[in-house]
Amino acid sequence: MERYFTELAVAFVRGRLGRSDATLEEGFDAGLRLHKFKQNTELPRVKRVLGMLHGLAPESLLDIGSGRGTFLWPLLASFPDLPVTAIDWSERRVSDLVAVRTGGVERLSVERMDVEHLSFPPAAFDVVTMLEVLEHLSNPVEGLRRVVQTARRAVIVSVPSVPDENPEHLHLFRVEQLRDMAAEAGCSRVTLEHVLNHRIMLCQKP
């Protein structure tokens, strides 16, 4: 049987069905789409970012562009006491995230918001993660500046490192571009790694 992030999947089922005693099996019977909760911790970029976060030991975290939870579910499972705020622009994705919170994961806060309209105060979160988002932005320099401003200590960003056919990918960033953008955004220390067709950038603030 396939492995799931069971606690999170059950919370989603309870949030969707409106019952605090609902089970995973009842979710399947009700036709809820639970495949998004299959365990994927071994995705190379997810595994590496989680490793970086263990080194940082964040006190609070903002995840930008949480989507269907490819990174968010492993994050919540790996850091069971970490307060996490998840934002996404898709109403459907946000609705799914809210169901998880409503179903019992109270340390998860959810907002419908995009990078270009971040409304959090400066240094509102200890660490900010933004995976597979920067390449979608029409103005990535300004977007990264806003993200860095929202973080107290550090920002972790991942972007594709090879061309693809996704029409929503507006940019393919070189290492030098990312370093320059991070410095311009206010990062004093920038570390870049390459992990299976992706670049992962750790930006630390003074």
PLM feature segments, named:
Residues L131-L134, S158:
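Residues lining the SAM
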Residues L137-S138, A151-R152:
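Helix-to-beta-strand junctions that scaffold the AdoMet/dcAdoMet cofactor pocket
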Residues R146-T150:
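Conserved helix-to-beta-strand junction in the class I
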